[in-house]
Amino acid sequence: MTRKYFGTDGIRGRVGEAPITPEFVIHLGYSAGKVLTSSDWHLSKGERPAVLIGKDTRISGYMLESALQAGLSAAGVDVLLSGPMPTPAVAYLTRALRLQAGIVISASHNPFEDNGIKFFSALGAKLPDATEQEIEAGLNAPLKAMPSAQLGKARRVNDARGRYIEFCKSTFPNHLDLRGLRVVVDCAHGATYQIAGPVLHELGAEVVAIGIHPDGLNINHECGATHGAALQEAVRHHRADIGVALDGDGDRVIMTDGEGMLYDGDQLIYLVAKHRKQNGLLKGGVAGTLMTNLAIENGLKKLDIPFARANVGDRYVLELLQIKNWQLGGEGSGHIICLDKHTTGDGIISALQVLYAMRDSGKTLTELASDVTLYPQQLINVRVPKGFDAHNSLAIKTAQAEAERDLDTTGRVLLRASGTEPLIRVMVEGESGQKVKHWAEKIAEVVRNAAAGERSVEKALPN
């Protein structure tokens, strides 16, 4: 059974347009509540299931939170409200408070006009596909509230922020601190705005916090992990030792050194893996994605660290880690998963693992990263007819084979279809920037011509 609403990261869309409407979200809460109350959650007789709702700082969060709460309450589920809270914090608190599920209202790194809803299980992991399908199956059922005595209650979790701050700090070794470090942290006017700074400060750092004035409309706007320029400028202006930028819901991180040089998720994973390997702390290998820079794979090989690629998306990285029984993985966008520290990707905790490597080794971020330089990489998006399959084109196959022969072991070619738009993404990377540019443009042109030919055939066909 295919899912209509749930994607790889919950349900997401433009606010006010289906499915991100108050009416839909009430039904979503009700259906999710009915699934919870009908499942075997090992509850005592008469005990109601309880769910935590967290959100980021989008103005639409108030509306969607109320709708979700109403639907859950109508189904007989108690609701705990955390207010603005990072996605990984909701995953942690769901486990820590022994709740039946956690729900996050967020569209992550997207602009404020978008929003979304994602679910966590009692174990702090994303819901199994089967459970999401069960929730979807109940969306069209009539909303019939429980008798008044059985309606769910709601309350605020006033210590949610403090609990999560302490959890983050617990992932940093007790024998080390951040005294003497000036750290700029960019919270993207998002869910970490009252959390990331205190975590770093309580570990001893001198903290300069930016992106901490959310107004409901400015989340991710020219700041945070998707706009590193704001962090670079602040690090240089304040003469900081290091910079940390998170996205709107706190599950992504990028960093800068004291010169303002940006380090993406690929590089940060490499640094953490290298430190763990050198100290006998690395279990297994590292999971990346199809887009992980080849220089990272080659660098890990030199350190005798196994590496494997998953499809793009932190959900698939997590699945690969679980299959291989490894602990460390992620992607260049800044989703980093440390399964020995948390059940899901966590921007703050990932940054702390990099800071741990710095403090433990006595080296700066620049020094730690000096042995690996990312290969030039070019990505070109080519618009194609819906359903176009690049792998069926002999011309495209020939061009790709020619590029791979020329690049040999010093480069890589990847063609993949977008999961959301009618696009073929042409990615070429390698040691030679000149070769990368040449082959990316050549293959993209071949794809355009093949797609144009298919359009011509479509037009020639009778209606």
Curated annotation (Swiss-Prot):
Cofactor: Mg(2+)
Keyword Phosphoprotein: yes
Enzymatic class: isomerase
One Pfam family from the record: PGM_PMM_III
GO CC, one annotated term: cytosol
Keywords, sorted A to Z: Isomerase, Magnesium, Metal-binding, Phosphoprotein
Alphabetical list of InterPro entries matching this protein: A-D-PHexomutase_a/b/a-I (IPR005844), A-D-PHexomutase_a/b/a-I/II/III (IPR016055), A-D-PHexomutase_a/b/a-II (IPR005845), A-D-PHexomutase_a/b/a-III (IPR005846), A-D-PHexomutase_C (IPR005843), A-D-PHexomutase_C_sf (IPR036900), A-D-PHexomutase_CS (IPR016066), Alpha-D-phosphohexomutase_SF (IPR005841)
EC number annotated for this UniProt entry: 5.4.2.10
Keyword DNA damage: no
Active site positions: 108 (phosphoserine intermediate)
Gene3D superfamilies: Alpha-D-Glucose-1,6-Bisphosphate, subunit A, domain 3, Alpha-D-phosphohexomutase, C-terminal domain
Binding positions (Mg(2+)): 108, 247, 249, 251
PROSITE patterns, alphabetized: PGM_PMM
One BP term from GO: carbohydrate metabolic process
GO molecular function (one): phosphomannomutase activity
Annotated function: Catalyzes the conversion of glucosamine-6-phosphate to glucosamine-1-phosphate.
NCBIfam families: glmM, PRK10887.1
Similarity-based family: Belongs to the phosphohexose mutase family.
Protein name as annotated: Phosphoglucosamine mutase
